[in-house]
């Protein structure tokens, strides 16, 4: 039996991991920010020692992309705390699996093919830069980075739940159609992570991997599929990013190649539309 620590408890991925791990033989400890602040080096070290942690799944992160353009706390959490965590995990021979993002890319404005795991990062906002710098520390200390993209779940604040809400209150919506990535369900990502732990593959991994659902879409196409599944009468029209200016720039293209993770025979990617339908069914059940 392995002792697993999941940080960022209460977030959509940690909730999905808790669900996916319900019937496993391993011991999962899932802690919220209030219960374990990854910026508190001494508290993290005490947890690793006292619980004899074998694997840390770090879901804790500063994720407000807009606010990060002005709030430098993003670097304290996504870079400095992650560097400290990875150093401690190396010291105590604990496997670290750190969750990262497609937003470490974006600087290559002509890109139109999926990013490989070893492609150079080129973030275009503070959030992406902080995550890229955190990744560097994890890899330097022998840890595992799993990049994902456009994450959503049946819980919390995310694009799917927002669009479902808006389609019930607004007759029309405009959604950007010039940013392309892959919508990814926290449910499928969590099952993949728990599977790696159950099969003990995680103990023999290091470096950078990508995991998203299969396929790609723009935010507009994503919104249209949400509306279709929900039989919403709201009219959704496409617009450009210049029509919806934001403080933080977003990648025009950030599709991730899953080449490396798919070398594991047990990894089966779920089509993003299938995963979305499952999530929406769960939302409606709640």
Regions picked out by a protein language model, each given a short descriptive name:
Residues 208, 218-224, 239-279, 283-286:
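Conserved C-terminal active-site "lid" loop/helix of NAD(P)H-dependent oxidoreductases
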Residues 69-97:
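NAD(P)-cofactor binding segment of oxidoreductase domains
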Residues 38-79:
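NAD(P)H-binding glycine-rich loop region in Rossmannoid oxidoreductase-like domains
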């Amino acid at each position: 039996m392995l002792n697993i620590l999941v940080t960022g408890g209460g977030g959509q991925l940690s909730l999905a991991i808790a669900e996916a791990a319900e019937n496993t033989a391993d011991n999962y400890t899932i802690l919220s920010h209030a219960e374990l602040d990854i910026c508190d080096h001494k508290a993290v070290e005490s947890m690793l020692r006292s619980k004899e942690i074998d694997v840390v799944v770090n879901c804790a992160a500063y994720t407000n992309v807009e606010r990060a353009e002005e709030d430098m706390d993003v670097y304290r959490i996504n870079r400095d705390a992650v560097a400290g965590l990875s150093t401690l995990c190396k010291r105590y021979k604990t496997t670290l699996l750190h969750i990262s993002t497609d937003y470490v890319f974006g600087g290559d404005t002509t890109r139109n093919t999926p990013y490989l795991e070893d492609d150079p990062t080129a973030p275009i906002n503070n959030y992406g830069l902080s995550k890229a710098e955190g990744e560097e520390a994890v890899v330097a200390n022998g840890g595992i980075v799993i990049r994902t993209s456009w994450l959503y779940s049946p819980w919390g604040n995310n694009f799917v739940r927002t669009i479902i809400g808006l389609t019930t209150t607004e007759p029309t919506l405009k959604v950007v159609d010039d940013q392309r990535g892959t919508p990814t369900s926290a449910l499928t990502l969590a099952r993949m992570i728990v599977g790696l732990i159950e099969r003990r593959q995680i103990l023999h991994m290091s470096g950078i991997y990508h995991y998203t659902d299969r396929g790609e879409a723009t935010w507009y196409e994503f919104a249209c599929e949400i509306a279709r599944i929900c039989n919403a009468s709201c009219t959704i029209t496409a617009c450009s990013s210049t029509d919806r200016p934001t403080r933080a720039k977003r990648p025009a293209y950030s599709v991730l190649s899953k080449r490396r993770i798919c070398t594991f025979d047990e990894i089966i990617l779920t089509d993003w539309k299938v995963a979305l339908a499952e999530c929406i069914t769960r939302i409606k059940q709640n």
